[in-house]
Amino acid sequence: MKIRSQVGMVLNLDKCIGCHTCSVTCKNVWTSREGVEYAWFNNVETKPGQGFPTDWENQEKYKGGWIRKINGKLQPRMGNRAMLLGKIFANPHLPGIDDYYEPFDFDYQNLHTAPEGSKSQPIARPRSLITGERMAKIEKGPNWEDDLGGEFDKLAKDKNFDNIQKAMYSQFENTFMMYLPRLCEHCLNPACVATCPSGAIYKREEDGIVLIDQDKCRGWRMCITGCPYKKIYFNWKSGKSEKCIFCYPRIEAGQPTVCSETCVGRIRYLGVLLYDADAIERAASTENEKDLYQRQLDVFLDPNDPKVIEQAIKDGIPLSVIEAAQQSPVYKMAMEWKLALPLHPEYRTLPMVWYVPPLSPIQSAADAGELGSNGILPDVESLRIPVQYLANLLTAGDTKPVLRALKRMLAMRHYKRAETVDGKVDTRALEEVGLTEAQAQEMYRYLAIANYEDRFVVPSSHRELAREAFPEKNGCGFTFGDGCHGSDTKFNLFNSRRIDAIDVTSKTEPHP
């Protein structure tokens, strides 16, 4: 057993209001520059829908993630090394800019410079940020399907409608929707790492964050295809691939990510999970896709177990990280209460950004008396959002974990309503789903109140273990892709626009 630590995230979809604050703040901090105008490290999608980029869940088209071979071994869906090498100069499974959208701005200056004698009111026409030319019509955007925008024929192409009679959901009275914030999953078994020909992508040992070494990256873009969540973007200005860095400078300081910090709905939780690194391959190679969720749970370790603590210390896990794991809200929601579920575990990457399925539309339907009663709790299998749809999204089609999570959330609400409204203790619903009163009270504290100190338990990094950064700063300066060499742009056969270094010139004002 080799114990490692990972900073994971849980998003409570029951409280997401689709305000896109997380997307905007992430965009302003990390990708508001030339070359990645189209890139959104964090975006919020409306489901059902094809998402961003279009149809990203269709792995028959994009070949992302892993497949299990007949001999039980894993292989990237793109193919083995020889097959990857054969596609290195022409990757047929790479999403194009039209699968994302052509980034644009508007000619606002025209509103000020238009001649006064014009017969029509001046307008700000869209202009492409890639070509610089004016656009006749905006065809697409990062949240083009926001709030069920578009006709149902396009929304019905959502892969999560598999095994569902989707025709009935085209009728207005049967319409449903939910918000799905997405970011890099920082997987335990990342396919992007395996498909990178340059070996530029790595997973940090201390916190599990997956990063791209900008010095090693050569812009082959195989990682974009390899990532089944399509959360790696190509910077056409620098010729490098970029992705969500989980705000690691903030994580190292014990602070939450920008998207978590600015979330107005308090839906995001950050915490440490201890896992057995030796069990990753066995878990990801599970034959039945529906068992992948449980196999990933088996990889996680109990931070309160004395044997686990002893082994973690031997493996170099700092005591502060172990203590943070014991207080982790992610561990509580994923392991203790089993409310949080992984996004598309069938990709076999063992994702580490998990989701609590939405309950709000279900609860409102129950209040209106539209549902049959199953004992104390309503029958959650006949609710507005199809349970099979949530299962296709979160548990590879297995409805049992989704039903358990929904019933436990309903039971907690039933218990708290009896306590606050009726002034009595009614534990019948809790007993039906296997929860104690203490667990229900703690669930209420974390899910409903969601205090800052409960949502974010992030240990600061141990700077005493890091090497001195001043010599690196003094020797290398600001470089991208060319190590510690000069700022001259070298010849590049595949991308002449690549920037190897940025010149930083200092200007000194003359003394009077």
Curated annotation (Swiss-Prot):
Needed co-factor(s): [4Fe-4S] cluster; [3Fe-4S] cluster
Cofactor note text: Binds 3 [4Fe-4S] clusters per subunit. Binds 1 [3Fe-4S] cluster per subunit.
Record domain 4Fe-4S ferredoxin-type: where: 7-35, 175-206, 208-237
PROSITE patterns: 4FE4S_FER_2 (PS51379)
Matching CDD domains: NarH_beta-like
Function: The nitrate reductase enzyme complex allows E.coli to use nitrate as an electron acceptor during anaerobic growth. The beta chain is an electron transfer unit containing four cysteine clusters involved in the formation of iron-sulfur centers. Electrons are transferred from the gamma chain to the molybdenum cofactor of the alpha subunit.
Subunit details: Dimer of heterotrimers each composed of an alpha, a beta and a gamma chain. Alpha and beta are catalytic chains; gamma chains are involved in binding the enzyme complex to the cytoplasmic membrane.
Name of this chain's protein: Respiratory nitrate reductase 1 beta chain
